[in-house]
């Protein structure tokens, strides 16, 4: 997804809700709220640290992957970077650890919410029209599957 389409994508995937409104309408779970607010308050946070802070470990909270995936699918949270641990010589090793952030933190609140004046369905139609021009052989069902996830 190119930068210019992120506001419409967020508007469509969020169904026109900012996170607080989604919570107020009873459409978000307590665990989602806790994860979202922790990331939003910190700015950026490694998954390892996030799991520790919210007690997602053996004998603690469960469902971290489910909640974080849902928040990503709704475009309230995204992976900002992958950070590699370092050995005693300062060399990176192993798998990268996801660093989560909100799109608002990465791109700015005004930019992310710039499509909020549109109906989410209008944002969807704009994205579909763009994808049809880029992927002329794709069916509408295939394109919808791409943007819905």
Give the location of each predicted region.
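Long, low-complexity intrinsically disordered regions
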Residues: 1-149
């Amino acid at each position: 997804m190119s930068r210019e389409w992120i506001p419409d994508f967020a508007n469509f995937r969020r169904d026109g809700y900012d996170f607080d409104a989604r919570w107020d309408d009873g459409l978000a779970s307590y665990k989602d709220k806790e994860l979202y607010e922790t990331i939003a308050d910190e700015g950026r946070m490694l998954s390892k640290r996030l799991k520790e802070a919210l007690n997602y470990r053996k004998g603690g909270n469960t469902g971290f992957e489910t909640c974080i995936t849902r928040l990503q699918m709704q475009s309230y949270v995204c992976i900002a970077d992958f950070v590699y641990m370092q050995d005693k010589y300062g060399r990176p090793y192993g798998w990268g650890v996801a660093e989560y952030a909100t799109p608002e933190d990465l791109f700015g609140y005004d930019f992310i919410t710039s499509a909020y004046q549109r109906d989410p369905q209008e944002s969807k139609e704009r994205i579909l029209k763009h994808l049809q021009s880029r992927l002329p052989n794709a069916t509408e069902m295939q394109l919808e599957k791409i943007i819905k996830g």
